[in-house]
C-alpha cells in the first residue's frame, strides 16, 4: 500500500463517518503496532503517551505521537470511555482482526484502492517503509516493531525493482 492509497482510505473512512476506523488506521500506521496489539492502546496509554505492549513473551513501549493523542483524546471523550481499550465494538469488546479487515475492505471502492492491497498489516508495513526511508536505521526500526531479529525487519524495508533501478540510474557512475 502506498502513502497515497492510505490517504484515500482515510478520506473514505472520514466521508463514511467511520471515526473509529479512521483513528484505528492512523493508530496502526503512526505507531507500527500489530493489529493484535490494538488492545494495548488504552485510555490510560493515551493519557501517558506510551502504550505498554506485551506480545510473544516480550515487553516493549510504543510511543504515541502528540497529534494522535489529541485525536484519540477527543474520541475517548465522545465515546465516554473512562478506562480500558480505546477501540471496542458497540458491546464494549475489543475489536478483532476480522472486524477491522472487513471494515477496511468496505472502503476500497470509495477510496479507489485495490482490495488486494487493503489489510491491517499493510499499515504496519507502510509505517516501517516510511520510517526506514527517513531514518535508514534498521536496528532502531526492529526495536520499534518488536522484532528480535533484524532479518525479520528487512522484509518490511525491501524496495521494489523499480526503486532500485531509479536509484542505480541516479548514481552517475557512467561517462558517455
Report residues per predicted region.
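DNA breakage-rejoining catalytic core of tyrosine-based enzymes
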Residues: 1-7, 57-67, 81-83
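Basic, Lys/Arg- and aromatic-enriched nucleic-acid-binding interface segment
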Residues: 3-31, 35
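Short, leucine-enriched amphipathic alpha-helices that occur as contiguous helical runs
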Residues: 6, 20-22, 97, 101, ...
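C-terminal catalytic core of tyrosine-transesterase DNA break-rejoin enzymes
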Residues: 26, 30, 124-148, 155
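Conserved tyrosine-mediated DNA breakage-rejoining catalytic core shared by Y-recombinases
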Residues: 31, 35-36, 40-74
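Catalytic-site neighborhood detector that most strongly recognizes the C-terminal catalytic loop/helix
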Residues: 56, 145, 150-170
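Active-site/catalytic core of tyrosine-dependent DNA strand-transfer enzymes
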Residues: 66-114
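C-terminal secondary-structure termini that scaffold catalytic or DNA-interacting sites
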Residues: 172-176
Amino acid at each position: 500500500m502506498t502513502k497515497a492509497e492510505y490517504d484515500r482510505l482515510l478520506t473514505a473512512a472520514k466521508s463514511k463517518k467511520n471515526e473509529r476506523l479512521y483513528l484505528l488506521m492512523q493508530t496502526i500506521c503512526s505507531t507500527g503496532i500489530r493489529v493484535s496489539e490494538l488492545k494495548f492502546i488504552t485510555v490510560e496509554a493515551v493519557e501517558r503517551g506510551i502504550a505498554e505492549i506485551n506480545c510473544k513473551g516480550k515487553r516493549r513501549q510504543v510511543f504515541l505521537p502528540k497529534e494522535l493523542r489529541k485525536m484519540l483524546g477527543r474520541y475517548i471523550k465522545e465515546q465516554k470511555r473512562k478506562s480500558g481499550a480505546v477501540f471496542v465494538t458497540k458491546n464494549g469488546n475489543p475489536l478483532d482482526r476480522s472486524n477491522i479487515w472487513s471494515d477496511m475492505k468496505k472502503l476500497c471502492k470509495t477510496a479507489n484502492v485495490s482490495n488486494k492491497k487493503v489489510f491491517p498489516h499493510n499499515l504496519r508495513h507502510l509505517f516501517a517503509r516510511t520510517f526506514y526511508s527517513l531514518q535508514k536505521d534498521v536496528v532502531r526500526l526492529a526495536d520499534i516493531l518488536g522484532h528480535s531479529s533484524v532479518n525479520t525487519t528487512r522484509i518490511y524495508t525491501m524496495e521494489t525493482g523499480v526503486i532500485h533501478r531509479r536509484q542505480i540510474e541516479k548514481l552517475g557512475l557512467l561517462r558517455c
